[in-house]
Amino acid sequence: MNQAKRIVFLSSLLLLTFNVLNAASLKVGVIGLDNYQAVAFANLFQTAKPGEPLAGFEVVAAFPGGSPDIPESVQGLPRWTERFEQMGIPRVNSVADVVERADVVILMSLDGRVHLKQATPVLKAGKPLYIGRPMAASLVDVLKIFQLAKAHQTPLFSCSQH
């Protein structure tokens, strides 16, 4: 799936969530700022004009995350975190802070090993969740994530262009 299709697919999920929550605006939280996709999605939300499909979406919290043993994460984190700061998006200190501030969450951490841990509080709080690639580092973790979503009746979505 190419980047444009992925963005349309994510946007559709968030619009569905937007309609389900029946809100005039939707507060989006971002977990994992160590890749360009987190910036791309945040930029789409922050720059939508009234009347456009993503109007009313606002990124209200961003938790950097990062994995010290993944070179791409180490190299990308400062660069992409700075872009979030340039957009005026508040940086928070934990996943719990994101959950507290957001209506919906996008989990964009490069490291699939942390996805179950990062997704758990989001799903337990009943916040709709999109997980970027990879869904998780193992099938066992993927199944646990979906079990949590089902147990807490929380919308969950993931996809990849690769």
Where are these regions (language model features)?
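Bacterial N-terminal signal peptides that target proteins for export
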Residues: 1-9
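Bacterial N-terminal signal peptides
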Residues: 8-19
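N-terminal glycine-/serine-/threonine-rich beta1-alpha1-beta2 phosphate-ribose binding loop
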Residues: 13, 23-125, 143, 151
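Hydrophobic residues in well-ordered beta-strands that form the structural core
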Residues: 93, 131, 156-158
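Short, intrinsically disordered, low-complexity terminal segments
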Residues: 1, 20-21
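Short helix/strand-capping hinge loops at secondary-structure junctions
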Residues: 126-128, 133-134
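A contiguous active-site-proximal alpha/beta segment in oxidoreductase catalytic domains
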Residues: 136-162
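A general structural signal for short secondary-structure boundary/capping elements
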Residues: 75-77, 132, 138
